[in-house]
């Protein structure tokens, strides 16, 4: 049986792989390289358009739990991430080019996957899994809006990507390698700012000119990828309690904690490119260079890529989708990825995994897995399909949407690890039914 998967991002790539591994013939349709969105830079599958970090690796983090669930269940995205990992303290960060190439090669070489390039403007007949992501083309978005009732089913807001600089252009006499609280290895470049330097930077950042917006009707901002200039305008100290917080960092040149610290994280395996952590932005390119050069260690920084802002499109999933990411009104159509309202790289891959596994089981005449809310995979699918939610917003995985333990555990870290252990025990029991 053939299944059409539309979109070869994280969710679509994961879904196509899982279906193909289960013996289904998959037609993977991807608009790149024929048409490339403003946020994409290559024709590779599973391109990371924002940060190169898949966030926390430990089981005290909900996203760390989600990664471990996927890893144990045979996720191609986690396999690729582990194979292309770069040092990032307690986080799982990857060489973005190596990661995308790994996934692209795996899919193109799979005997059950046929790749068709070109824009899709309407859904084909038969079983379809739609994973066109936050950058769904206008034509397909219009088609989906009509398909889902002709209402405001798709909402628009902005995501933003941080600039990249060459390591050799960073003034390391004004910066140092360390991780916060010396946790893990010293993987971050830390750029200290004294009070006067920070305040001058903050004032210019607040006043800096943003790039012109074309073709968008609103500017709703999701907190997880908020532009640094928007955050700065919320108050003089907002950045110092956010991405520029100095806590846990001591400047070796002064022996004390700086007033503010800008952190840079390795963006490729070679360590030749670093990204400005938390500096997603929609400023004009010239303004980025002018304002960010006020950070002492970046006064002569060479920008490999300036920050950009792009649209995000997602469905009113509680009204439209069930816990298997299927369209309630037309179950032959399944959705996955950020357009369902899951937010983040790992969450997108997780939705693609669950959607594909449950789709395969339905087509095979098997009972659904029904991942429970005690697991991260189940919690996400139950969140996006919760009909009691009225003002639906995109959501990262977090322990708040996973079922509580039902008993007290002293300490937040211990409690979270206990929740993770419970989840992984459930995953191990489900594993024989799922893993191919």
Residues of each region from the PLM?
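Beta1/beta-strand and adjacent pyrophosphate-binding region of the FAD-binding site
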Residues: 1-11
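N-terminal FAD cofactor-binding segment of flavoenzymes
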Residues: 17-79, 373-384
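A short alpha-helix-loop-beta-strand transition element characteristic
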Residues: 59-63, 67, 75-88, 148-158, ...
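Feature captures the FAD/FMN-dependent oxidoreductase FAD-binding
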Residues: 69-143
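Predominantly flavin-linked oxidoreductase catalytic cores and closely associated redox partners
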Residues: 109-285, 289-290
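A glycine-rich dinucleotide-binding beta-alpha-beta segment and adjacent secondary-structure elements
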Residues: 276-342, 349-351, 369-386, 394-396, ...
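Internal hydrophobic alpha-helix adjacent to the cofactor/substrate pocket in enzyme cavities
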Residues: 348-369
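C-terminal auxiliary extensions adjacent to catalytic cores
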Residues: 395-436
């Amino acid at each position: 049986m053939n299944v059409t998967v539309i979109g070869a991002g994280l969710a679509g790539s994961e879904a196509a792989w899982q279906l193909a591994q289960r013996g289904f013939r998959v037609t993977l349709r991807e608009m790149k390289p024929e048409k490339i969105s403003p946020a994409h830079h290559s024709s590779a599958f599973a391109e990371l358009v924002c940060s190169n970090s898949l966030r926390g690796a430990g089981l005290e983090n909900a996203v760390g739990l989600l990664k471990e669930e996927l890893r144990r269940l045979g996720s191609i995205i986690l396999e690729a991430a582990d194979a292309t990992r770069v040092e990032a303290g307690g986080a799982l960060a990857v060489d973005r080019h190596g990661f995308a190439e790994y996934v692209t090669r795996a899919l193109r070489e799979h005997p059950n996957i046929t790749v068709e390039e070109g824009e899709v403007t309407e859904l084909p007949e038969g079983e379809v899994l739609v994973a066109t992501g936050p950058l769904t083309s206008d034509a397909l978005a219009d088609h989906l809006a009509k398909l889902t009732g002709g209402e405001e089913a798709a909402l628009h807001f902005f995501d933003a990507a941080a600039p990249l600089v060459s390591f050799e252009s960073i003034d390391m006499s004004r910066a140092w390698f360390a991780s916060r609280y010396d946790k893990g290895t010293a993987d971050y470049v830390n750029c200290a700012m004294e009070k006067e330097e920070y305040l001058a930077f903050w004032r210019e950042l607040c006043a800096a000119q943003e790039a012109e917006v074309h073709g968008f009707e609103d500017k709703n901002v999701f907190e997880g990828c908020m532009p640094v200039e928007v955050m700065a305008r919320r108050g003089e100290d907002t950045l110092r309690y956010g991405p520029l917080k100095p806590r846990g960092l001591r400047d070796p040149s002064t022996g004390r904690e700086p007033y503010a610290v800008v952190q840079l994280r390795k963006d490729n395996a070679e360590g030749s490119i670093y990204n400005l952590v938390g500096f997603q932005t929609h400023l004009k390119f010239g303004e980025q260079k002018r304002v960010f050069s006020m950070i002492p260690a970046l006064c002569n920084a060479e920008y490999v890529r300036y920050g950009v802002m792009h649209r995000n499109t997602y469905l009113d999933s509680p009204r439209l989708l069930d816990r298997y990411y299927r369209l309630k009104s037309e179950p032959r159509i399944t959705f996955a990825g950020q357009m369902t309202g899951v937010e983040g790289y790992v969450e997108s891959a997780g939705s693609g995994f669950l959607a594909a596994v449950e789709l395969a089981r339905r087509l095979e005449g098997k009972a659904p897995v029904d991942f429970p809310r005690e697991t991260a995979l189940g919690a996400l699918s139950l969140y996006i399909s919760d009909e009691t939610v009225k003002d639906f917003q995109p959501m990262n995985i977090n322990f708040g949407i996973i079922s509580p333990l039902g008993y007290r555990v002293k300490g937040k870290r211990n409690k979270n690890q206990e929740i993770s252990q419970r989840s992984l025990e459930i995953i191990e029991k489900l594993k024989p039914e799922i893993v191919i």
